[in-house]
Amino acid sequence: YDILLVADEVICGFGRTGNMWGAQSFDVQPDMLTCAKALSSAYLPISAVMMAEHVYAPLRAQAEQLGIFGHGYTYSAHPVCAAVALRAQQLIQERDIIGHVRHLAPVFADRIGRLQAFDFIGHTRSIGLIGAVEFAADKITKCKFDPTVKIASQAVAIIQNHGVILRALPGDIIGFCPPLIITELELNDMFDRVEKAFVEVSELAAQHR
């Protein structure tokens, strides 16, 4: 359709899905790509925009007429942030972080999938080391809980009491996004704690059906 495709890789980039870029995991080739956060492992703020040659070429052509590349921000190209980002990327390669994610992905998928055994979980999904569980008042119809109950937010609070910090997302969803350096032992411990917390969440869910 002659429309540029931009991939937002701020969360999914740098190995999160088991490939360097999330787009690769879904066999998608974007025209432009945005990234941040894991670019420097979040030690210092930095972001970047990457683009294919067919997008860059007209920008370059116009810049040559102006005598300067017409793009920039007041705080761009900070040398310390750039140095930290460079070292972070070196460590990702040296420690084979992507290989580690691929090794743990089946364990992650299995453990998050087991959570569907709880009668208030309507759906689970994951790729690499990112996943989510979706709450449902009825597992068959996938009917949602009353949004005023904020079941996911309440569940997150209960889970936190068991030592795991997760995030409630719109639509009664809880996201899982563990550190890419997590060990298999730590991963299983995390899900063991979530399962214990979900026993308490079961009582909460029963009250609001």
Briefly describe each language-model feature range.
Residues 1-209:
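Conserved N-terminal phosphate-binding loop of PLP-dependent enzymes in the Aspartate aminotransferase
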